[in-house]
Amino acid sequence: MCGIMGAVSERDISKILLEGLRRLEYRGYDSAGIAVIDSQDRLKRVRIQGKVQNLADAMQETAIAGNTGIAHTRWATHGKPSEQNAHPHLSHGEIALVHNGIIENHEHLRQQLITYGYQFTSETDTEVAAHLIHYHYQQHENLLLAVQKAAAEMQGAFALGVIHQKRPEELVAIRKGSPLVLGFGIGENFIASDALALRSFAQSVIYMEEGDSACVTTQDIKVYDSNRILVQRAVHPLNSDSEIVNKGPYRHFMLKEIFEQSKVITDTLESRINSIDVLRASFGEKASHIFPMVKNIHIVACGTSYHAGMIAKYWLESLAGLPTQVEIASEYRYRDVVVPDNTLFITVSQSGETADTLAALFKAKQSNYLASLAICNVATSTLVREADCVFLTRAGIEIGVASTKAFTTQLAAFLMLAAALCKDNRAQEVLRQLQELPACCERVLQMNEEVESLASLFVNKVHALFLGRGVQYPVALEGALKLKEISYIHAEAYPAGELKHGPLALVDKDMPVIAVAPNDELLDKLKSNLHEVSARGGQLFVFVDDSQNWKANGARLIKVPSCGAWLAPIVYTIPLQLLAYHVAVAKGTDVDQPRNLAKSVTVE
């Protein structure tokens, strides 16, 4: 959840570290800090509560410069957001350390270190790592070995970046369950949680593998495997791309990403839907052998990706006739799962580094599944490397914490999967509709001003209720999630048919009720449910197919351009994204970086 940046260079790296943190801020923004070794081999540190800009302001007031350093932006796990708990953490003024992840046995290690005479100044598990590395350095005077030995004692999933004032020419990194990237520059080398942070500085990168440690200097990067054996890892070119971090004409990244959906869906579909055979090949070389044997499907994901899986269940069961079970990854990994014969295991993740999703995949690989399939947006992610089959969405980098374009490209991928597994001519109709999807999205985006006009009606609301039926129920769930994430309005979603089983008790004149009402086989049923809301005086907002003649009966009707039935869940998602965005803007919340959240959930 936190962002790590580090560099060893022939030049001052303070501004490089700061720019890297700006690109990692999506991973956490409770506090930030930097530590460098200056020209006199002194360890200098600046920490601040709040966002990276606060750190930049503090650095203006403090002369901090050096050729070796580490920096960090934090999402709080152990210890409240504060300067005291911010990284980097020090040990004896000699070692500085940044950390992403959780050290599960930190309490035991803390007590052990106290008996050795170490004193703690923070509430974090990270300070335990700093002191433990210092302890081992005292024994061996080898920073790499000290980090390796300390990591062997620590339980959990984490990544570390470490410097020592007596070793000003080197930076040590280790990965154990949390992603870390090594970057090669000219006269300088780097570490980072995400290659995005290195795009302006590094020419190529190594994606550290599980258990890897590395010693980074200006001249070289040496990588060691989990057995501390020097190894060669694949080096990948890194293309600079300034557009990825620019909002362009948009006020927020989230709005930019909403409006990019037509393009990224086009990119995701490109060269994949020419025919069913071509489509099946898009899921990897093994897919042609695996797909004919599939009898059941398990989908495991978190958050927005879980909602994508719920929608996929309707498509896969309807089109492919395959029993499909959808699980929340954090629940799946801790229960006994019955795996029927010939079950395909599917994981979905934007980043491919979501901790619970990865743990679920590792569990599945030890179970009796036919094969695993990853639907992911990051080609170099752990999820992609570990799965048997892969479908890469082409959403591009998503900066806004609330996922938009990553979600709709996941849905496009799932609809393609359902078509690939379909055994009758309905697959051709799905392909035809998919070809129309980008244009449908463009038409829906033209609703922006109309949806914006609704925002003032929600600004002072405390609660909201979203309703849908059938495949639109997960769409309602996603709409509720978006609203609560960025506007901080408590929002729930229910199947409309469940109104009488509890949620109707919440409905009164102050409760906005948002319904998703495409022209499908459940429309008449949904209308009956909405009459129940109107009869109780609820404030009803209904997103309806513009080809239908609705009687408002006091409801606010928002007409959505008609689209093919298979596309409706994707198309109706977009106005709900716009609604959440404009309500958040009207309330003055931080749209791209909502409180208490982070983009990439790399801790349990």
Curated annotation (Swiss-Prot):
Xref: CDD domains: GFAT, SIS_GlmS_GlmD_1, SIS_GlmS_GlmD_2
Domain Glutamine amidotransferase type-2: from-to ranges: 2-219
GO molecular function: carbohydrate derivative binding; glutamine-fructose-6-phosphate transaminase (isomerizing) activity
Domain (SIS): residue spans on this chain: 279-427, 454-594
Assigned GO CC terms: cytosol
Keywords: Aminotransferase, Cytoplasm, Glutamine amidotransferase, Repeat, Transferase
Catalytic activity annotation: D-fructose 6-phosphate + L-glutamine = D-glucosamine 6-phosphate + L-glutamate
Cross-referenced InterPro entries: GATase_2_dom (IPR017932), GFAT (IPR005855), GFAT_N (IPR047084), GlmS/AgaS_SIS (IPR035466), GlmS/FrlB_SIS (IPR035490), Ntn_hydrolases_N (IPR029055), SIS_dom (IPR001347), SIS_dom_sf (IPR046348)
EC number: 2.6.1.16
SUPFAM superfamilies xref list: N-terminal nucleophile aminohydrolases (Ntn hydrolases), SIS domain
Pfam families assigned to the protein according to its UniProt record, in alphabetical order: GATase_6, SIS
Origin superkingdom: Bacteria
Cell compartment(s), UniProt: Cytoplasm
Catalytic-site annotation from UniProt: 2 (nucleophile), 599 (for fru-6p isomerization activity)
Gene3D superfamilies: Glucose-6-phosphate isomerase like protein, domain 1 (3.40.50.10490), Glutamine Phosphoribosylpyrophosphate, subunit 1, domain 1 (3.60.20.10)
Keyword Cytoplasm on entry: yes
Gene Ontology biological-process annotations: carbohydrate metabolic process; fructose 6-phosphate metabolic process; protein N-linked glycosylation; UDP-N-acetylglucosamine metabolic process
Functional description taken from the UniProt entry: Catalyzes the first step in hexosamine metabolism, converting fructose-6P into glucosamine-6P using glutamine as a nitrogen source.
Subunit description: Homodimer.
UniProt xrefs under NCBIfam families: glmS (TIGR01135), PRK00331.1 (NF001484)
Name recorded for this polypeptide: Glutamine--fructose-6-phosphate aminotransferase [isomerizing]
Phylogenetic placement of the source organism: Bacteria, Pseudomonadati, Pseudomonadota, Gammaproteobacteria, Legionellales
Gene assigned in the entry: glmS
